[in-house]
Amino acid sequence: MIERLLRVIPVRLSKGPVAPAASPSRPRLLWQDPEYEVELFEQLGPERADCEARMLAAGLPLPVQHRTEWAIVHPTRRLWFVAVKAAGAGYQAGFAVDVSRSRAMPGHVLFSVEKFGAALSDGARAAGLRALAHLGRSRARVLRVHVDVYAQDRAIRERVGTLLQELGFRSAAQSRTYRDTVLVDLAPDEDGILATFRRSTRRNIRQIAEQPFEVRTIARPAPVGRLEALLGESLARTGGPPHHEDWNGVTALSDRCPELSRLTGLFRTDAQGPEALVAFAWGLNHGDYVDNPATGMTRLPRSRTPFTYALIWDLIRWAKRAGARWFDFGGVTMGHLREGDPLGGISDFKRGFSNTIVAVGEEWTLEPNPLRGQLAAALSSASSYVSRRLRAVAQAMPIRNTSPV
Protein backbone atom coordinates (compact mmCIF):
# COMPACT_ATOMS: atom_id res chain seq x y z
CA MET A 1 0.00 0.00 0.00
CA ILE A 2 2.71 2.48 1.00
CA GLU A 3 4.90 1.60 -2.00
CA ARG A 4 1.95 2.24 -4.33
CA LEU A 5 1.41 5.67 -2.80
CA LEU A 6 5.09 6.52 -3.18
CA ARG A 7 5.35 5.60 -6.86
CA VAL A 8 6.37 9.09 -8.03
CA ILE A 9 10.08 8.40 -7.29
CA PRO A 10 11.37 4.90 -6.48
CA VAL A 11 12.37 4.75 -2.83
CA ARG A 12 13.69 2.24 -0.36
CA LEU A 13 12.02 2.15 3.03
CA SER A 14 14.19 1.47 6.05
CA LYS A 15 13.74 -2.18 7.03
CA GLY A 16 13.10 -2.95 10.67
CA PRO A 17 13.55 -0.57 13.58
CA VAL A 18 15.89 2.37 13.17
CA ALA A 19 19.22 1.72 14.88
CA PRO A 20 19.65 3.72 18.08
CA ALA A 21 21.81 6.80 17.72
CA ALA A 22 25.10 7.01 19.57
CA SER A 23 23.99 10.23 21.29
CA PRO A 24 20.46 11.50 22.05
CA SER A 25 21.13 14.65 20.02
CA ARG A 26 22.52 12.85 16.96
CA PRO A 27 20.13 12.31 14.03
CA ARG A 28 18.55 9.00 13.03
CA LEU A 29 18.26 7.91 9.42
CA LEU A 30 14.55 8.22 8.70
CA TRP A 31 14.38 7.74 4.93
CA GLN A 32 16.65 6.97 2.02
CA ASP A 33 16.37 6.78 -1.76
CA PRO A 34 19.01 6.87 -4.51
CA GLU A 35 19.23 10.66 -4.41
CA TYR A 36 18.43 11.75 -0.85
CA GLU A 37 18.90 10.81 2.79
CA VAL A 38 16.44 12.17 5.33
CA GLU A 39 17.53 12.52 8.95
CA LEU A 40 15.41 12.96 12.06
CA PHE A 41 16.64 15.01 15.02
CA GLU A 42 14.50 14.27 18.08
CA GLN A 43 16.66 16.27 20.51
CA LEU A 44 18.34 19.65 20.50
CA GLY A 45 22.11 19.63 20.41
CA PRO A 46 25.19 20.75 18.50
CA GLU A 47 24.47 18.35 15.65
CA ARG A 48 21.10 19.94 14.88
CA ALA A 49 22.51 23.45 15.29
CA ASP A 50 25.30 22.61 12.84
CA CYS A 51 22.78 21.16 10.38
CA GLU A 52 20.69 24.35 10.49
CA ALA A 53 23.80 26.51 10.11
CA ARG A 54 24.77 24.58 6.97
CA MET A 55 21.28 25.09 5.51
CA LEU A 56 21.36 28.82 6.20
CA ALA A 57 24.87 29.13 4.75
CA ALA A 58 23.63 27.41 1.58
CA GLY A 59 20.95 30.08 1.20
CA LEU A 60 17.95 28.11 2.50
CA PRO A 61 15.53 30.38 4.39
CA LEU A 62 14.33 28.56 7.51
CA PRO A 63 11.10 29.88 9.05
CA VAL A 64 11.55 30.78 12.71
CA GLN A 65 9.31 27.91 13.88
CA HIS A 66 11.83 25.49 12.34
CA ARG A 67 14.85 26.94 14.13
CA THR A 68 16.69 25.73 17.22
CA GLU A 69 16.18 29.17 18.79
CA TRP A 70 12.39 28.68 18.65
CA ALA A 71 12.64 25.28 20.31
CA ILE A 72 14.89 26.64 23.08
CA VAL A 73 12.33 29.25 24.19
CA HIS A 74 9.51 26.65 24.06
CA PRO A 75 11.01 23.94 26.30
CA THR A 76 7.64 22.30 27.09
CA ARG A 77 7.00 21.48 23.43
CA ARG A 78 8.41 18.48 21.53
CA LEU A 79 9.86 19.91 18.34
CA TRP A 80 11.64 17.42 16.09
CA PHE A 81 13.61 18.42 13.02
CA VAL A 82 13.63 16.65 9.65
CA ALA A 83 16.68 17.35 7.46
CA VAL A 84 17.00 16.36 3.79
CA LYS A 85 20.50 15.75 2.43
CA ALA A 86 21.29 15.30 -1.26
CA ALA A 87 24.04 12.90 -2.28
CA GLY A 88 27.19 14.95 -2.77
CA ALA A 89 25.37 18.29 -2.38
CA GLY A 90 24.74 18.69 1.35
CA TYR A 91 21.52 19.70 3.07
CA GLN A 92 18.74 20.86 0.76
CA ALA A 93 15.66 21.19 2.99
CA GLY A 94 14.59 21.06 6.61
CA PHE A 95 11.50 21.56 8.73
CA ALA A 96 10.31 21.15 12.31
CA VAL A 97 7.61 18.69 13.37
CA ASP A 98 5.58 19.73 16.40
CA VAL A 99 4.68 16.57 18.33
CA SER A 100 1.73 17.21 20.64
CA ARG A 101 -0.41 14.96 22.81
CA SER A 102 -3.96 14.16 21.76
CA ARG A 103 -6.54 15.35 24.26
CA ALA A 104 -9.16 13.05 22.76
CA MET A 105 -7.12 9.84 23.06
CA PRO A 106 -4.50 9.70 25.82
CA GLY A 107 -1.25 8.08 24.77
CA HIS A 108 -1.62 9.23 21.16
CA VAL A 109 0.08 12.12 19.39
CA LEU A 110 -0.46 14.62 16.60
CA PHE A 111 2.21 15.78 14.14
CA SER A 112 2.07 19.34 12.83
CA VAL A 113 4.35 21.18 10.39
CA GLU A 114 4.08 24.94 10.03
CA LYS A 115 5.15 26.98 6.99
CA PHE A 116 6.35 24.08 4.86
CA GLY A 117 7.72 25.03 1.47
CA ALA A 118 11.30 26.31 1.60
CA ALA A 119 13.82 24.04 -0.16
CA LEU A 120 16.80 24.31 -2.47
CA SER A 121 15.29 21.78 -4.90
CA ASP A 122 11.95 20.21 -5.75
CA GLY A 123 13.43 16.77 -5.17
CA ALA A 124 14.47 17.62 -1.62
CA ARG A 125 11.05 19.06 -0.87
CA ALA A 126 9.41 15.85 -2.14
CA ALA A 127 11.80 13.62 -0.19
CA GLY A 128 10.97 15.50 3.00
CA LEU A 129 7.25 14.95 2.50
CA ARG A 130 7.71 11.25 1.75
CA ALA A 131 9.75 10.89 4.92
CA LEU A 132 7.09 12.74 6.93
CA ALA A 133 4.33 10.44 5.64
CA HIS A 134 6.50 7.41 6.43
CA LEU A 135 7.16 8.75 9.94
CA GLY A 136 3.44 9.12 10.57
CA ARG A 137 2.60 5.66 9.28
CA SER A 138 5.46 3.91 11.04
CA ARG A 139 4.27 4.93 14.51
CA ALA A 140 0.99 3.35 15.53
CA ARG A 141 -0.01 6.08 17.98
CA VAL A 142 0.09 8.97 15.50
CA LEU A 143 -3.51 10.08 14.94
CA ARG A 144 -2.96 12.90 12.48
CA VAL A 145 -0.26 14.63 10.44
CA HIS A 146 -1.07 18.27 9.60
CA VAL A 147 0.97 20.22 7.05
CA ASP A 148 0.63 23.98 6.67
CA VAL A 149 2.08 24.84 3.25
CA TYR A 150 3.41 28.36 2.71
CA ALA A 151 4.72 29.47 -0.69
CA GLN A 152 4.14 32.59 -2.74
CA ASP A 153 4.92 30.58 -5.87
CA ARG A 154 1.69 28.97 -7.06
CA ALA A 155 3.60 26.27 -8.95
CA ILE A 156 5.31 25.14 -5.73
CA ARG A 157 1.99 24.94 -3.90
CA GLU A 158 0.50 22.91 -6.75
CA ARG A 159 3.41 20.45 -6.86
CA VAL A 160 3.34 20.04 -3.09
CA GLY A 161 -0.43 19.56 -3.12
CA THR A 162 -0.24 16.94 -5.86
CA LEU A 163 2.39 14.95 -3.99
CA LEU A 164 0.54 15.19 -0.68
CA GLN A 165 -2.59 13.81 -2.33
CA GLU A 166 -0.57 10.90 -3.72
CA LEU A 167 0.74 10.27 -0.21
CA GLY A 168 -2.80 10.04 1.17
CA PHE A 169 -3.23 13.57 2.52
CA ARG A 170 -6.52 15.44 2.13
CA SER A 171 -7.26 19.13 2.08
CA ALA A 172 -7.89 20.14 5.70
CA ALA A 173 -11.57 20.39 6.59
CA GLN A 174 -10.95 23.17 9.12
CA SER A 175 -8.47 25.95 8.51
CA ARG A 176 -5.91 26.82 11.18
CA THR A 177 -4.10 29.54 9.30
CA TYR A 178 -4.58 31.89 6.35
CA ARG A 179 -4.69 31.30 2.61
CA ASP A 180 -4.50 34.86 1.29
CA THR A 181 -2.47 37.76 2.61
CA VAL A 182 -1.36 41.33 1.97
CA LEU A 183 2.30 41.76 1.02
CA VAL A 184 4.43 44.90 1.16
CA ASP A 185 7.40 44.95 -1.22
CA LEU A 186 10.53 45.90 0.74
CA ALA A 187 12.75 46.53 -2.30
CA PRO A 188 12.50 50.38 -2.20
CA ASP A 189 14.18 52.44 0.51
CA GLU A 190 12.12 53.49 3.55
CA ASP A 191 10.86 56.68 1.91
CA GLY A 192 9.94 54.71 -1.18
CA ILE A 193 8.05 52.12 0.85
CA LEU A 194 6.21 54.83 2.77
CA ALA A 195 5.21 56.50 -0.50
CA THR A 196 3.39 53.33 -1.61
CA PHE A 197 0.97 53.50 1.33
CA ARG A 198 -2.39 55.20 1.07
CA ARG A 199 -2.41 58.85 2.08
CA SER A 200 -4.60 58.12 5.11
CA THR A 201 -2.16 55.41 6.24
CA ARG A 202 0.80 57.80 6.05
CA ARG A 203 -1.19 60.41 7.98
CA ASN A 204 -2.10 57.94 10.71
CA ILE A 205 1.56 56.92 11.10
CA ARG A 206 2.60 60.57 11.53
CA GLN A 207 -0.15 61.33 14.05
CA ILE A 208 1.45 59.19 16.75
CA ALA A 209 4.59 61.37 16.81
CA GLU A 210 2.42 64.41 17.60
CA GLN A 211 0.81 62.87 20.69
CA PRO A 212 2.02 61.59 24.10
CA PHE A 213 2.99 58.12 22.88
CA GLU A 214 6.24 56.36 22.12
CA VAL A 215 7.06 53.19 20.21
CA ARG A 216 9.57 50.85 21.84
CA THR A 217 10.26 47.14 22.10
CA ILE A 218 8.70 45.09 24.89
CA ALA A 219 11.38 43.33 26.92
CA ARG A 220 11.38 40.65 29.61
CA PRO A 221 9.66 40.02 31.89
CA ALA A 222 6.71 39.94 29.54
CA PRO A 223 3.62 41.86 30.71
CA VAL A 224 1.60 38.71 30.04
CA GLY A 225 -1.66 39.90 31.56
CA ARG A 226 -1.63 43.16 29.63
CA LEU A 227 -0.71 41.51 26.33
CA GLU A 228 -3.50 38.97 26.71
CA ALA A 229 -5.98 41.72 27.60
CA LEU A 230 -5.05 43.79 24.53
CA LEU A 231 -5.21 40.77 22.24
CA GLY A 232 -8.51 39.62 23.74
CA GLU A 233 -10.03 43.08 23.33
CA SER A 234 -9.00 43.20 19.67
CA LEU A 235 -10.37 39.72 18.94
CA ALA A 236 -13.64 40.59 20.67
CA ARG A 237 -14.06 43.57 18.36
CA THR A 238 -13.36 41.60 15.19
CA GLY A 239 -14.98 38.31 16.19
CA GLY A 240 -11.73 36.44 15.62
CA PRO A 241 -11.11 33.01 17.17
CA PRO A 242 -9.25 32.78 20.51
CA HIS A 243 -5.50 33.11 20.16
CA HIS A 244 -3.15 31.84 22.86
CA GLU A 245 0.53 32.68 22.83
CA ASP A 246 3.46 32.02 25.15
CA TRP A 247 4.41 35.65 25.69
CA ASN A 248 7.30 34.77 27.95
CA GLY A 249 8.66 32.68 25.08
CA VAL A 250 8.08 35.53 22.64
CA THR A 251 10.01 38.06 24.72
CA ALA A 252 12.74 35.49 25.43
CA LEU A 253 13.18 34.91 21.69
CA SER A 254 13.13 38.66 20.98
CA ASP A 255 15.83 39.27 23.61
CA ARG A 256 17.91 36.27 22.56
CA CYS A 257 17.59 36.77 18.79
CA PRO A 258 16.48 40.34 17.99
CA GLU A 259 17.10 39.67 14.31
CA LEU A 260 14.44 36.91 14.32
CA SER A 261 11.68 38.28 16.56
CA ARG A 262 10.49 41.76 17.49
CA LEU A 263 7.69 42.55 19.94
CA THR A 264 7.03 46.26 19.71
CA GLY A 265 4.64 48.29 21.84
CA LEU A 266 3.00 51.69 21.92
CA PHE A 267 3.27 53.27 25.36
CA ARG A 268 1.64 56.34 26.84
CA THR A 269 4.25 58.83 28.06
CA ASP A 270 1.74 60.36 30.49
CA ALA A 271 1.02 57.09 32.35
CA GLN A 272 2.89 54.44 34.32
CA GLY A 273 2.47 50.72 34.95
CA PRO A 274 0.87 48.06 32.74
CA GLU A 275 -1.90 50.41 31.58
CA ALA A 276 0.70 52.57 29.81
CA LEU A 277 0.91 49.87 27.12
CA VAL A 278 -2.01 50.54 24.76
CA ALA A 279 -1.03 48.44 21.72
CA PHE A 280 1.50 45.86 20.54
CA ALA A 281 2.56 44.14 17.33
CA TRP A 282 4.76 41.08 16.91
CA GLY A 283 6.97 40.32 13.94
CA LEU A 284 8.86 37.13 12.99
CA ASN A 285 11.69 37.09 10.45
CA HIS A 286 11.59 33.95 8.29
CA GLY A 287 14.52 34.93 6.09
CA ASP A 288 13.01 36.20 2.87
CA TYR A 289 9.90 37.63 4.53
CA VAL A 290 8.64 38.90 7.89
CA ASP A 291 5.11 38.19 9.07
CA ASN A 292 2.87 39.61 11.80
CA PRO A 293 1.42 36.73 13.86
CA ALA A 294 -0.35 38.88 16.45
CA THR A 295 -1.46 42.45 17.09
CA GLY A 296 -3.56 43.84 19.92
CA MET A 297 -4.77 47.22 21.10
CA THR A 298 -7.20 49.01 23.36
CA ARG A 299 -9.23 52.14 22.79
CA LEU A 300 -8.92 55.15 25.05
CA PRO A 301 -11.88 57.35 25.97
CA ARG A 302 -12.17 60.44 23.78
CA SER A 303 -9.28 59.27 21.62
CA ARG A 304 -9.55 58.47 17.92
CA THR A 305 -5.83 57.82 17.50
CA PRO A 306 -5.23 54.68 15.36
CA PHE A 307 -2.57 53.03 17.49
CA THR A 308 -1.40 50.12 15.36
CA TYR A 309 -0.34 52.07 12.26
CA ALA A 310 2.90 53.22 13.90
CA LEU A 311 3.63 49.72 15.19
CA ILE A 312 3.25 48.08 11.79
CA TRP A 313 5.50 50.75 10.28
CA ASP A 314 8.08 49.95 12.98
CA LEU A 315 7.96 46.25 12.02
CA ILE A 316 8.21 47.05 8.30
CA ARG A 317 11.32 49.16 8.91
CA TRP A 318 12.80 46.35 11.03
CA ALA A 319 12.05 43.83 8.27
CA LYS A 320 13.78 46.07 5.73
CA ARG A 321 16.88 46.40 7.93
CA ALA A 322 16.94 42.61 8.48
CA GLY A 323 17.15 42.01 4.73
CA ALA A 324 13.66 40.58 4.17
CA ARG A 325 12.11 40.96 0.72
CA TRP A 326 8.46 41.09 1.82
CA PHE A 327 6.31 41.99 4.79
CA ASP A 328 3.37 39.60 5.22
CA PHE A 329 0.39 40.91 7.21
CA GLY A 330 -0.61 37.43 8.37
CA GLY A 331 -3.81 36.95 6.40
CA VAL A 332 -6.61 38.98 4.86
CA THR A 333 -10.25 38.52 3.91
CA MET A 334 -11.70 39.70 0.62
CA GLY A 335 -14.60 41.54 2.28
CA HIS A 336 -14.87 45.05 3.67
CA LEU A 337 -16.29 46.48 6.89
CA ARG A 338 -19.07 48.24 4.99
CA GLU A 339 -20.13 44.88 3.53
CA GLY A 340 -20.65 43.30 6.93
CA ASP A 341 -17.47 41.21 6.95
CA PRO A 342 -16.61 40.85 10.69
CA LEU A 343 -12.92 40.92 9.75
CA GLY A 344 -13.43 43.57 7.09
CA GLY A 345 -12.17 46.39 9.30
CA ILE A 346 -8.79 44.83 9.96
CA SER A 347 -8.55 43.75 6.31
CA ASP A 348 -9.24 47.33 5.20
CA PHE A 349 -6.49 48.46 7.58
CA LYS A 350 -4.01 46.05 5.96
CA ARG A 351 -4.98 47.07 2.43
CA GLY A 352 -4.08 50.64 3.38
CA PHE A 353 -0.43 49.55 3.32
CA SER A 354 -0.54 47.62 0.04
CA ASN A 355 -2.85 46.52 -2.77
CA THR A 356 -0.79 43.37 -3.34
CA ILE A 357 -2.96 40.44 -2.24
CA VAL A 358 -1.69 36.96 -3.01
CA ALA A 359 -2.52 33.36 -2.15
CA VAL A 360 0.26 31.78 -0.10
CA GLY A 361 -1.19 28.98 2.01
CA GLU A 362 -2.78 25.55 1.86
CA GLU A 363 -3.44 23.00 4.62
CA TRP A 364 -3.37 19.22 4.37
CA THR A 365 -4.00 16.39 6.82
CA LEU A 366 -3.18 12.69 6.89
CA GLU A 367 -4.74 10.09 9.18
CA PRO A 368 -2.14 7.30 9.22
CA ASN A 369 -4.46 5.07 11.28
CA PRO A 370 -8.00 5.85 10.05
CA LEU A 371 -9.88 3.79 12.66
CA ARG A 372 -8.04 5.43 15.54
CA GLY A 373 -8.55 8.81 13.88
CA GLN A 374 -12.29 8.27 13.57
CA LEU A 375 -12.50 7.18 17.20
CA ALA A 376 -10.58 10.28 18.31
CA ALA A 377 -12.89 12.51 16.27
CA ALA A 378 -15.97 10.87 17.82
CA LEU A 379 -14.58 11.26 21.34
CA SER A 380 -13.68 14.89 20.69
CA SER A 381 -17.16 15.60 19.31
CA ALA A 382 -18.81 13.93 22.31
CA SER A 383 -16.62 15.88 24.72
CA SER A 384 -17.52 19.15 23.01
CA TYR A 385 -21.23 18.30 23.18
CA VAL A 386 -21.05 17.52 26.90
CA SER A 387 -19.13 20.74 27.56
CA ARG A 388 -21.74 22.79 25.69
CA ARG A 389 -24.59 21.14 27.59
CA LEU A 390 -22.90 21.74 30.95
CA ARG A 391 -22.36 25.41 30.11
CA ALA A 392 -26.00 25.74 29.06
CA VAL A 393 -27.19 24.15 32.32
CA ALA A 394 -24.90 26.38 34.37
CA GLN A 395 -26.17 29.50 32.62
CA ALA A 396 -29.79 28.46 33.19
CA MET A 397 -29.36 27.90 36.94
CA PRO A 398 -30.47 30.78 39.17
CA ILE A 399 -27.59 32.58 40.86
CA ARG A 400 -28.01 33.45 44.53
CA ASN A 401 -26.86 36.97 45.31
CA THR A 402 -24.21 36.65 48.02
CA SER A 403 -22.87 40.20 47.82
CA PRO A 404 -22.94 42.22 51.05
CA VAL A 405 -25.82 44.62 51.52
List each language-model region with its residue ranges.
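Acidic-and-aromatic substrate-binding clefts and catalytic sites of carbohydrate-active enzymes
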Residues: 120-123, 151-156, 223, 335-342
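Active-site/acyl-donor-binding loops of N-acyltransferases
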Residues: 2-45, 99-105, 164-191, 325-405
